[in-house]
Amino acid sequence: GFKGAFKNVMFGIAKSAGKSALNALACKIDKSC
């Protein structure tokens, strides 16, 4: 239902936010950007 869809959206947002945060961190560490 609606709750499940909302949970999936929130999970997707959290996942992509975490990914970009990790990428930014890796970029700072090894200066690859």
Curated annotation (Swiss-Prot):
Disulfide bonds join 27-33. It comes from the Eukaryota. Its main location: secreted. It is found in: Secreted. Keywords: Amphibian defense peptide, Antibiotic, Antimicrobial, Disulfide bond, Secreted. GO terms for biological process: defense response to bacterium. This is Brevinin-2PTb. Expressed by the skin glands. Belongs to the frog skin active peptide (FSAP) family. Brevinin subfamily. Has antibacterial activity against the Gram-positive bacterium S.aureus ATCC 25923 (MIC=9 uM) and the Gram-negative bacterium E.coli ATCC 25726 (MIC=9 uM). GO terms for cellular component: extracellular region.
